[in-house]
Amino acid sequence: MTVYHFVGIKGTGMSSLAQILHDMKHTVQGSDYEKRFFTQTALEKRGISILPFDKNNIKEGQVIIAGNAFPDTHEEIVAAKELNIPVHRYHHFLGDLMNQYTSVAVTGAHGKTSTTGLLAHVMQGAHPTSYLIGDGTGHGVENSKYFVFEACEYRRHFLSYYPDYAIMTNIDFDHPDYFADINDVFNAFQEMALQVKKGIIACGDDEELQKVQAKVPVIFYGFGEDNDFQARNIQKRTDGTIFDVFVRNTYYDTFKITGYGDHSVLNALAVIALCHYENVDVEAVKHQLTTFEGVKRRFNEKPMGEQVIIDDYAHHPTEINATIEAARQKHPEREVVAVFQPHTFSRTEKFLDEFAESLSKADQVYLCDIFGSARENKGELTIEDLQKRIDGAELITDTTTDVLKKHKNGVLIFMGAGDIQKFEAAYVKEVQVAEK
């Protein structure tokens, strides 16, 4: 019996892949740091073993899949090589796996996870679909027709993939610790485009994506009239969004989605265009769009007393703009309060003014200390450099969250890609203790 062992199984992509293989009746286990991570819940529900890192975890006959964050000097990877066991890097293994299906890669600087989740949900309503989402969610179906997966541009990892289709949501400068500038990012996407085998669904409102060249048809979607798929007559409501879709200037149908903000309309348009291209029944698409409940850490909302708490992964100025816009659409009468934890010193330094501008669209801003990545845990920059650029911004720690109580009718948006959930949990606990 082959055992698939994941080195770093709690990583979001790794966790998703482990779930897929388990669902396909393979034996799966993995190792990681003992600190609890949100991806553990889905692994534990499936009974997948999570071990502490130990070279003795590695045994002959296993298939070793290693997360991209772990170097070749990691004790388990060294142990595998000593036993002459091949070590498959996550993105290479995924690239081989998807070749068994009609594969759809979802990529872009922003909106990847939400669009992947939405596409997987919609496709499942019509055909057996396996999927891998960057929020740590994965699902495998043995007789799948489609394989939908999130493909990340960071360090050009998506160049390991040769998908049938690619949805490209946008090109924007991010990951300044790796990419030199917007041209470097564009070149990565251009290279990816040349690896797609059947067709590309790209946002035509994005100036960078308009320049992409490909060997396959490129279908553009967006709000502009030049797009192949265009959203018109948009009704932004507190219970979602309704819009008409025109295909090459001819009315196609009217759709309702559960999401808020322009970015949610664009994500849905991408899914509608892909499904149209694959002849998925439009009634199935319409129904599935109305039943989508979202993905983890993307505008996840819960009421707490008179307040509303939103948990969101937004960690780039463009994403912060979108999240605040969505909150204002759904809760037009409420005060919008942003609680933001910058993620990585390099990103914070590069986009300092842009962060200040986007956060200033909230009514009140609270800033947590900068969360350094594993590759860079210190920098000369401090959170005060961002604070002084935002009028009225206050600093907050996980022991001073009680200050948020004064926003009695507020929408509290906890945003960040680090451990911002620690601050949210501290505040929830603070409120619960006060209520006793």
From Swiss-Prot:
Keywords: ATP-binding, Cell cycle, Cell division, Cell shape, Cell wall biogenesis/degradation, Cytoplasm, Ligase, Nucleotide-binding, Peptidoglycan synthesis
Cellular component, GO annotation: cytoplasm
Reactions this protein catalyses: UDP-N-acetyl-alpha-D-muramate + L-alanine + ATP = UDP-N-acetyl-alpha-D-muramoyl-L-alanine + ADP + phosphate + H(+)
GO molecular function annotation: ATP binding; UDP-N-acetylmuramate-L-alanine ligase activity
Localization (cell): Cytoplasm
GO BP terms, alphabetized: cell division; cell wall organization; peptidoglycan biosynthetic process; regulation of cell shape
Pathway in which the depicted protein is active: Cell wall biogenesis; peptidoglycan biosynthesis
EC number(s) recorded for this UniProt protein: 6.3.2.8
InterPro entries attached to this UniProt entry: Mur-like_cat_sf (IPR036565), Mur_ligase_C (IPR004101), Mur_ligase_C_dom_sf (IPR036615), Mur_ligase_cen (IPR013221), Mur_ligase_N (IPR000713), MurCDEF_pg_biosynth (IPR050061), UDP-N-AcMur_Ala_ligase_MurC (IPR005758)
Binding residues for ATP: 108-114
Coiled-coil residue windows: none
Hydrolase keyword on record: no
Taxonomy, superkingdom: Bacteria
Function in brief: Cell wall formation.
Family note: Belongs to the MurCDEF family.
Cited NCBIfam families: murC
Listed PANTHER family: UDP-N-ACETYLMURAMATE--L-ALANINE LIGASE, UDP-N-ACETYLMURAMATE--L-ALANINE LIGASE-RELATED
Name of the molecule in the record: UDP-N-acetylmuramate--L-alanine ligase
Organism in which the protein naturally occurs: Bacillus mycoides (strain KBAB4) (Bacillus weihenstephanensis)
Gene: murC
